[in-house]
């Protein structure tokens, strides 16, 4: 679609308002070595060092890009986003004539993927890669052309996603091995985030795919991509992937749970409103500013609880949870005291994930009380920063960038730690180095660094069996790892579908 006839999108169009006052900050962003300069990121024809937000404000964008542009201007108003229209034009040109199973033009898929990334707070290179992620694999557009047009950084990200798409696992490969393989191929976490956004949009359109095919993809998603999203702290994406997978794999059970939750909704909403009112009234009376929201458990979560606890739907009492967000850690514990003065706590249901974070960096206070009517009420207490990290995990650093410049940000005020500030500048050259730079760094980042910085590679046989080898191994080493006789008889090798010399270092 030509940019010439497209409408101008106003600077301040759209954008969800935060549930409380707009929070501003003036936090310093720590620099890190290895950042690809802007002039190399997008190619010399695409980006100038002058202009910035004012220059991009006058650019005409395709209407399809409106959600992307709104999100970028919300989180990164100074970002030069002219490259997005050019990336869209290239993707639209090369995907022309291609259709989704839904019958929609194929271009709607990369645009939707990019919109998901933009709502995470992603910046230019990631967004351009989101728009272009299927061009090299599915069209005649070459990696050389992409590199020339958009620079090495965008090409690197697209190449990483393409390699993930080409992976075949084999029916005998263990789930943990596949997860490790996916992570090992995603040396830059941004590649994995693009892949997760890609899988999420595909999952949203499974209803247009044959039931059997959708169920197989859903099982793969539930076993591989949802846990990876959880490990990266991307709970918003994890929950949606789980619900969509559940709906595709067990449509009748899913529909029944949706129906039962719907029948309970009026009663649940009344209970929730009463609980929130009491909490808000108490906190207001002591001058403690907080945001109090309610959320239902996700359908898959309800199903899992019924399954693991051996309970019927009517025996699941904590379908709703109240979430309380405040500014500081100290205020979290102050709120806890007020909650316990309102209602008695249910024994054995208190968890302090602030002092003892989960492995994926999740932090909150969890407790269950006997709320109004003596009914169980699950309560979560966290800071705005903890909430952002709980929702967006490793992607939250993109939003920190906006906070660090004093731009408006949704729901939180941040004091970025060393690891999050370092991630602001882009490429994660060494997660281990980032972790070591901060003695307080969370266990999750150390664990992920071990996974991604490993000196071991995982190679799959044609039957899907996983073989762990030292980095630098060749096809001959792989053959002998299978069996000495296989190694003795090896005369050729094929890696990722291509014949290679026996001395080739395995990727």
Regions found by a protein language model. Name each.
Residues 2-377, 382-450, 459-465, 507:
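Active-site helical microenvironments for divalent-metal-assisted chemistry
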Residues 435-507:
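Ubiquitin-like/PB1-type beta-grasp interaction modules and other compact soluble beta-rich domains
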């Amino acid at each position: 679609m030509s940019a010439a006839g497209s409408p101008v999108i106003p600077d301040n169009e759209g954008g969800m308002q935060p549930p409380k006052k707009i929070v501003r900050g003036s936090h310093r962003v720590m620099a890190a070595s290895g950042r690809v300069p802007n002039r190399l990121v997008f190619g010399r024809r695409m980006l100038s060092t002058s202009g910035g937000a004012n220059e991009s404000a006058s650019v005409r964008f395709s209407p399809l890009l409106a959600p992307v542009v709104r999100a970028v201007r919300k989180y990164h108003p100074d970002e030069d986003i002219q490259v997005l229209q050019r990336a869209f034009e290239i993707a639209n040109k090369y995907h022309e004539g291609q259709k989704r199973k839904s019958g929609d033009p194929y271009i709607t898929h990369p645009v939707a993927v990019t919109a998901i990334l933009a709502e995470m707070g992603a910046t230019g290179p990631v967004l351009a890669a989101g728009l272009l992620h299927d061009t090299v694999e599915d069209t005649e557009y070459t990696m050389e052309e992409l590199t020339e047009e958009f620079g090495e950084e965008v090409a690197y990200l697209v190449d990483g996603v393409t390699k993930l798409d080409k992976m075949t696992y084999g029916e005998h490969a263990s789930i943990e091995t596949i997860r490790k393989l996916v992570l090992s191929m995603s040396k830059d976490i941004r590649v994995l985030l693009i892949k997760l956004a890609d899988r999420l949009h595909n999952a949203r359109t499974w209803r247009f795919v044959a039931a059997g095919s959708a169920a197989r993809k859903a099982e793969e998603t539930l076993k591989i991509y949802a846990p990876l999203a959880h490990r990266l702290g991307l709970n918003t994406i994890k929950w949606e992937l789980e619900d969509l997978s559940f709906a595709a794999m067990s449509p009748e059970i899913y529909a029944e749970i949706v129906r039962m939750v719907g029948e309970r909704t009026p009663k649940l909403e009344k209970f929730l409103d009463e609980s929130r009112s009491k909490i808000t009234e108490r906190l207001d009376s002591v001058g403690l500013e907080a945001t109090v929201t309610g959320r239902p458990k996700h359908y898959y979560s309800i199903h899992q609880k019924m399954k693991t606890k051996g309970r019927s739907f009517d025996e699941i009492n904590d379908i709703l949870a109240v979430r309380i967000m405040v500014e500081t850690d100290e205020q979290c514990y102050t709120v806890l005291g007020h909650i316990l003065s309102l209602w008695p706590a249910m024994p054995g249901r208190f968890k302090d994930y602030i002092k003892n974070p989960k492995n994926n960096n999740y932090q909150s206070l969890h407790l269950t009380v006997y709320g109004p009517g003596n009914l169980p009420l699950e309560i979560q207490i966290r800071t705005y920063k903890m909430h952002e990290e709980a929702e967006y995990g490793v992607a939250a650093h993109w939003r920190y960038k906006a906070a660090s410049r004093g731009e408006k940000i949704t729901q939180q005020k941040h004091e970025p730690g060393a690891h999050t500030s370092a991630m602001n500048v882009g490429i994660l050259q060494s997660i281990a180095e980032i972790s070591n730079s901060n003695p307080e760094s969370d266990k999750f980042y150390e664990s992920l660094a071990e996974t991604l910085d490993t000196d071991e590679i995982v190679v799959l046989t044609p039957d899907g069996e996983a073989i762990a080898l030292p980095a630098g191994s060749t096809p001959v080493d792989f053959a002998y790892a299978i069996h000495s006789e296989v190694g003795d008889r090896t005369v050729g090798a094929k890696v990722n579908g291509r014949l290679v010399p026996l001395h080739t270092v395995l990727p």
